[in-house]
Every structure is written in structure tokens, then in C-alpha cells.
């Protein structure tokens, strides 16, 4: 990871603290993973505070595949089976079947509809019957040990929400460039400056958790 690009954001602990402050204020954060892994940056919001405007930004500036990171317990509560029985994707990303809110949506594709789906899935008393399957929001199952178990954006998202004292659920989408290619660290830093969002890495979250 090119730490010089991240230097303006402080050290690892300072970068995580800045992200936690932003999340508590209902703002987005940008998380980059290891260069020898996916080497991509995700725009992440708290599912609890997510707005229609933020979802529209995710759809407009990112890949469009908006994912909802959930804990093991919530996946079980909602009875969401894996998308496939034999997950042989390169990094073992734990997609479940896609979902849609049963009520309050039309086609399910609009920013407002996707927010409605997210809110239905994270509601305190959410039940399996509250969601239709398939849909236009893609849940991801986070490993219980977080980034200390798997250094993925899914685990990083849930860890950040827990550390921020929020519900342990977040939405993410990979930041892309206008030509459809993936944004790397230099572009992620530029995006963060444009949108006043903190930038941090999965490695930062690992360091933060190990320091506690």
C-alpha cells in the first residue's frame, strides 16, 4: 500500500478514528484493501443512517452492485441462504441470495427502493417474510472474527460499524472510474477529497483492533 498517499490522513489509528467520527455523523468513508488482494476501494455507509441521496451516490459513482454487509446472526435471523452452495469465487465473498423489501417498493431498483430494502433487513424485529427473494440488494455475510479473520471489505465494514457504536450493518459499493474500470488508491484519495470523505485501509482496521 502506498502509504505516502495516505499520509495526509494521519497514521493508521488516526485514520480509523476519522472514519468512526464520519460514520457517527452519518457520512461515508472510503476503504481500500491490500494491493496484493483486490486492490480496490469501496464507498461505505452505515446502513442505520443511510439516506436516499447517499444510495444515489453509490449507484452513480460506483459499480451499481450495492451490497449490504450483515452479521452471521442477522443472516440467520432473516434465513438468507448462500447465493451458491459451493462458493469458489477468488476471495470467498459470502453473497447470499439477493433481497427486496416486501412492502414499500415498486421495481426495487431506484435509490429510494434500495434504501427501503436495506432498512427492512436491518430493522430490530426483521423477519424472513419481510423480504422478497431475489431482489436488487446483495447481502454479504461477514465472518464473526471480522478483519482479524478475513481481510475483506465485508468484515471491515461491520467492524467499523461496531467500533463506531452503530448497528453492525453497512452498505458498500466498489468505486469505479467514468470508463467503468476500478478506482485504485490514487483515484480513491482524489474521490475522498472531492466528497470530503476519510480514506483508510483494511490494514488500518486490523492495526486498530490489535491495539485495543
Curated annotation (Swiss-Prot):
Binding-site list for Mg(2+) 2: 38, 153
Binding residues annotated for Mg(2+) 1, in chain numbering: 38
Tagged with keyword S-adenosyl-L-methionine: no
A single Gene Ontology CC term: cytosol
Keyword list, A-Z: Lyase, Magnesium, Manganese, Metal-binding, Riboflavin biosynthesis
Pfam families: DHBP_synthase
One of the protein's GO biological processes: riboflavin biosynthetic process
Binding site for D-ribulose 5-phosphate: 37-38, 42, 150-154, 174
Cofactor: Mg(2+); Mn(2+)
Site (Essential for catalytic activity): 136, 174
Record carries keyword Transit peptide: no
Pathway, per record: Cofactor biosynthesis; riboflavin biosynthesis; 2-hydroxy-3-oxobutyl phosphate from D-ribulose 5-phosphate: step 1/1
Record EC number: 4.1.99.12
Coiled-coil annotated spans: none
GO molecular function per UniProt: 3,4-dihydroxy-2-butanone-4-phosphate synthase activity; magnesium ion binding; manganese ion binding
Known catalytic reactions: D-ribulose 5-phosphate = (2S)-2-hydroxy-3-oxobutyl phosphate + formate + H(+)
Cofactor note: Binds 2 divalent metal cations per subunit. Magnesium or manganese.
UniProt-listed InterPro entries: DHBP_synth_RibB-like_a/b_dom, DHBP_synthase_RibB
NCBIfam families: ribB
Subunit structure: Homodimer.
Protein family (similarity comment): Belongs to the DHBP synthase family.
Its job: Catalyzes the conversion of D-ribulose 5-phosphate to formate and 3,4-dihydroxy-2-butanone 4-phosphate.
Name of the molecule in the record: 3,4-dihydroxy-2-butanone 4-phosphate synthase
Species per Swiss-Prot/TrEMBL record: Shewanella piezotolerans (strain WP3 / JCM 13877)
Upper taxonomic lineage: Bacteria, Pseudomonadati, Pseudomonadota, Gammaproteobacteria, Alteromonadales
Amino acid at each position: 500500500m502506498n502509504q505516502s498517499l495516505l499520509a495526509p490522513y494521519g497514521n493508521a489509528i488516526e485514520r480509523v478514528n476519522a472514519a468512526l467520527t464520519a460514520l457517527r455523523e452519518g457520512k461515508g468513508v472510503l476503504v481500500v484493501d491490500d494491493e496484493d488482494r483486490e486492490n480496490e476501494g469501496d464507498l461505505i455507509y452505515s446502513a442505520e443512517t443511510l439516506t436516499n441521496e447517499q444510495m444515489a451516490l453509490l449507484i452513480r459513482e460506483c459499480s451499481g452492485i450495492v451490497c449490504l454487509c450483515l452479521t452471521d446472526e442477522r443472516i440467520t435471523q432473516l434465513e438468507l441462504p448462500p447465493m451458491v452452495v459451493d462458493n469458489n469465487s477468488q476471495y470467498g465473498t459470502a453473497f447470499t441470495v439477493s433481497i427486496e423489501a416486501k412492502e414499500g417498493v415498486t421495481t426495487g431498483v431506484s435509490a429510494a427502493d434500495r434504501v427501503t430494502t436495506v432498512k427492512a433487513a436491518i430493522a430490530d424485529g426483521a423477519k424472513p417474510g419481510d423480504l422478497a427473494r431475489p431482489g436488487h440488494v446483495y447481502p454479504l455475510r461477514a465472518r464473526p472474527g471480522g478483519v482479524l479473520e478475513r481481510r475483506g471489505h465485508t468484515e471491515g465494514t461491520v467492524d467499523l460499524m461496531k467500533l463506531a457504536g452503530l448497528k453492525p450493518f453497512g452498505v458498500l459499493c466498489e468505486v469505479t472510474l467514468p470508463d467503468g474500470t476500478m478506482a485504485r488508491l490514487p483515484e480513491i484519495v482524489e474521490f475522498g477529497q472531492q466528497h470530503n470523505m476519510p480514506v483508510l485501509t483494511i490494514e488500518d482496521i486490523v492495526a486498530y483492533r490489535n491495539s485495543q
